């Protein structure tokens, strides 16, 4: 069995691990600070708050759908390490705009920076997975993928916690995010420094040449069709897409769910986001232990079913929760209430199962195709992922506008998990 921890001592893995960790940390530091500031400090209407959360999620995801084909081609054609350095430099500039939005409490500036960070992540996303087969041995790829996924969610945890803590309340009851504005710029600078040490990852000189297509629509169609015609890749990509769509719905609804269904404040919303992040990180590392380094989908169906069962139990508990009191409950008050720890346990269970579901599928994508095509394969996956995630957020936004409660939206996730389990089973039969 390949122990993943030894990779954290290697020069060929640590720089990309730290760079992607800091990227995830900063994404979520900014997004959490933005959402907390807007929901608790600017808006006062539950429907407006839920709609904002869904729109913000959609704006971040939209660039993945539009620009992933260009990002994948670029990563396969050029040195991936050089692209990392360019992208991390851009992050500093984007966070200057985001910091201004936080300081001025300017919603358009915040949404602009959020969309720009989506573009940043679109170009970095294919690299953080596609670079692994170039720097790691074949029996290390699953371990490396698990660590990257775990690092991503630990970064989400850290950024989420700090983003929630740095949105502070003034004596007059208003909120500010001054320290969050400083933090997002500082983290972007550190990420650029770690990106400087990523080892070179040039394109394969023996790979067949391909024509770089700058036409966004045509390139996207060609890339997706060229990838999805392979049945195993089709099943893996659709299964991953269902996971991310479910995650998008859950993440978008955590703050309004906590405030409007559970009657709790931003500290509880931060706990929910943090719990989810820890769970995915635990599942990402645990699955490598279970599989012994083997790239296999044999646990995917059970993991997806477990996700659905935990979501259903979460829905059941939220439905019978006492609801709002005279004022929003803080973290200690919430945790002292009957059933609160079971809600947290359900969230943790959903996340652990999710990490165990998705990590082998990513490893499968990067090991099934030649190294010269890994970035484009991940990019095709990102296009399909983002398309389904945007569709999910649109459905969620429409459902909220039609009067569906935040709690009832959990049923959408539970239903999607059954389809994810079926896809995981089909992939297991096709590949294992």
Language model feature labels by segment:
Residues 1-14, 201-238, 261, 327-336:
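Juxtamembrane intracellular "pre-TM" segments in multi-pass secondary transporters
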Residues 40-43, 104, 108, 197, ...:
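Juxtamembrane transmembrane-helix termini
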Residues 52-54, 59, 66, 77, ...:
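C-terminal transmembrane bundle of multi-pass solute transporters/carriers
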Residues 9, 76-77, 103, 134, ...:
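Membrane-helix boundary and inter-helical linker elements of multi-pass secondary transporters
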Residues 14-32, 56-94, 109-168, 235, ...:
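Substrate-agnostic recognition of the 12-TM MFS/MFS-like secondary transporter fold
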Residues 33-64:
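Extracellular/periplasmic helix-loop-helix junction of adjacent transmembrane segments
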Residues 107-114, 118, 143-206, 279, ...:
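Hydrophobic alpha-helical transmembrane segments
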């Amino acid at each position: 069995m390949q122990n993943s921890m030894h990779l954290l001592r290697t020069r060929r893995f640590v720089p990309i691990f730290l760079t992607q960790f800091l990227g995830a940390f900063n994404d979520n530091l900014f997004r959490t600070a933005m959402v907390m500031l807007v929901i608790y400090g600017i808006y006062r209407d539950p429907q407006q708050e839920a709609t904002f959360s869904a729109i913000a999620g959609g704006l971040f995801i939209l660039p993945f759908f539009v620009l992933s084909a260009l990002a994948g081609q670029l990563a396969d054609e050029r040195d991936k390490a050089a692209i990392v350095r360019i992208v991390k430099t851009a992050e500093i500039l984007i966070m200057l705009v985001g910091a201004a939005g936080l300081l001025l409490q300017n919603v358009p500036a915040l949404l602009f920076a959020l969309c720009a960070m989506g573009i940043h992540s679109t170009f970095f996303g294919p690299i953080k997975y596609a670079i692994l087969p170039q720097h790691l041995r074949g029996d290390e790829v699953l371990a490396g993928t698990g660590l990257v996924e775990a690092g991503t969610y630990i970064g989400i945890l850290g950024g989420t916690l700090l983003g929630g803590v740095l949105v502070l309340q003034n004596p007059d009851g208003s909120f500010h995010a001054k320290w969050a504005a400083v933090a997002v710029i500082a983290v972007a600078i550190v990420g650029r420094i770690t990106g400087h040490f990523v080892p070179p990852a040039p394109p394969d000189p023996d790979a067949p040449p391909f024509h770089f297509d700058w036409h966004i629509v045509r390139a996207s169609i060609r890339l997706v069709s060229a990838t999805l015609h392979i049945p195993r890749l089709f099943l893996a990509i659709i299964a991953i897409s269902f996971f991310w769509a479910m995650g998008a719905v859950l993440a978008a609804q955590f703050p309004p769910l906590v405030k409007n269904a559970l009657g709790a404040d931003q500290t509880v919303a931060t706990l929910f986001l943090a719990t989810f992040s820890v769970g995915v990180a635990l599942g990402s590392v645990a699955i490598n232990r279970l599989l012994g380094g083997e790239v296999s989908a044999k646990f995917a169906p059970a993991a997806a079913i477990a996700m659905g069962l935990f979501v259903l139990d979460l829905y059941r508990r939220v439905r019978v929760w006492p609801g709002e009191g005279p004022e929003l409950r803080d973290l200690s008050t919430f945790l002292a209430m009957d059933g609160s720890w079971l809600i947290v346990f359900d969230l943790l269970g959903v996340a652990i199962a999710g990490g165990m579901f998705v990590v082998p599928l990513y490893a499968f994508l990067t090991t099934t195709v030649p190294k010269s095509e890994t970035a484009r394969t991940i990019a095709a996956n990102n296009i399909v992922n983002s398309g389904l995630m945007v569709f999910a957020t649109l459905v969620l936004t429409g459902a909220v506008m039609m009067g569906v409660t935040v709690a009832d939206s959990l049923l959408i996730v539970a239903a999607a998990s059954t389809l994810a389990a079926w896809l995981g089973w089909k992939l297991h039969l096709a590949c294992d």
